[in-house]
Amino acid sequence: MAIVSSITNHSSLPNDKGEERLVGPSLLKEELKLSQQDSLRPKSFDDFVGQSELKKVLEISVKASLKRGEALDHLMLYGPPGLGKTTMALVIAEELGVKARVTSAPALERPRDIVGLLINIQPRELIFVDEIHRLNRISQELLYPAMEDRRLDLTVGKGTSSRMRSIEIPPFTLVGATTKPAALSSPMRDRFGITQRLDFYNYLDLENIIKRSAKLINLVISEEASQQLAKRCRGTPRIANRLIRRVRDYAEVYSHSKKIDVEVVNDALDLHRVDQRGLDATDRSYIGLLVNQYQGGPVGLETLAAGLGEDSTTLETVVEPYLMQIGFLHRTSRGRVVTPAAKKHYLLTSPNNIDK
């Protein structure tokens, strides 16, 4: 399977010091340099760990389309970042035996970008559009007839002399990935024949991902070490693979070994200030402010943002979701409130009750 990529715009959200978060779900700058042929990516449904229900649905659809000799129905994959939407799209292309054209919505701002993508498409090829919810209205409307009727409707000329020209295109599969499916227009959503959600991974699946990745980069990791890593990666494979690379770096420099035990994992991640629940310094500062200055809340978002020197949108979309996921934070009509579990964890992991 060939992969053609035109992704030019991904962003990871840094903290207020301009540093990228090791446990953030978005791609880091170093990861942007990795191609879609990253050695840790699964190449088949069998290699893809987790998401068992999703895999079953897609395996059936892929096998049925191959049996009929037809293009797979258009597919929308949605869910939090870092769970494998891009990887799943590439696996599908591999299973179909077709080329994958990989792009993102910011690279498709102008009509000619859409036309350029579709005009040379080959029968049954797969187009993957990341962040598809960011497509503007004109780009979405250009895709409507392409997805439904396999044609491009182009306006030729200007003013009174303008006319509509339709160009037929071969059957193809559009795979759209999004963290915000509701941000897509209703007509756009309706044109996807298959819509599937990716969920956060359980500890067992994450352990298996970590073991698989360790083997691929020639590491020997103990059972206890893989369990410890799984607890710290926030249910997200992207973070799991990122952490195992950092642990590898630490082991090679300090242990001069490719054997990873639980002590190496703890030492490496303590150095990066990632605790046993996957919280980093930003998370602990957030909880610490609530616990130490506001007795656990409730506190308004803007007040917290001012106290931390962070943007309120960053807190709401990057910091808070994981804290809510693990039961450390409640959003109420009166403001943010930390739970007893959050207070207990904070007091245990911050000796002076303040994360400096």
Curated annotation (Swiss-Prot):
Biased composition range(s): Polar residues? 1-14
Tell me its EC number(s), please.
3.6.4.-
User: One Pfam family for this entry, by name?
Assistant: RuvB_C
Swiss-Prot/TrEMBL catalytic activity: ATP + H2O = ADP + phosphate + H(+)
Q: What residue intervals traverse the membrane?
A: none
This protein's superkingdom? Bacteria
Keyword hit for Nucleotide-binding: yes
> From the Swiss-Prot or TrEMBL record, what is one GO molecular function term?
four-way junction DNA binding
Instruction: Name the segments for region: Small ATPAse domain (RuvB-S).
Output: 202-273
- Positions that bind DNA: 331, 336
Q: Which residues are involved in binding ATP? A: 40-41, 82, 85-87, 191, 201, 238
How does the entry describe the domains? Answer: Has 3 domains, the large (RuvB-L) and small ATPase (RuvB-S) domains and the C-terminal head (RuvB-H) domain. The head domain binds DNA, while the ATPase domains jointly bind ATP, ADP or are empty depending on the state of the subunit in the translocation cycle. During a single DNA translocation step the structure of each domain remains the same, but their relative positions change.
Query: What is this protein's function?
Result: The RuvA-RuvB-RuvC complex processes Holliday junction (HJ) DNA during genetic recombination and DNA repair, while the RuvA-RuvB complex plays an important role in the rescue of blocked DNA replication forks via replication fork reversal (RFR). RuvA specifically binds to HJ cruciform DNA, conferring on it an open structure. The RuvB hexamer acts as an ATP-dependent pump, pulling dsDNA into and through the RuvAB complex. RuvB forms 2 homohexamers on either side of HJ DNA bound by 1 or 2 RuvA tetramers; 4 subunits per hexamer contact DNA at a time.
UniProt family annotation: Belongs to the RuvB family.
HAMAP family per the UniProt record, alphabetical: DNA_HJ_migration_RuvB
| Name the UniProt record assigns to this protein | Holliday junction branch migration complex subunit RuvB
Q: Organism, per UniProt?
A: Prochlorococcus marinus (strain NATL2A)
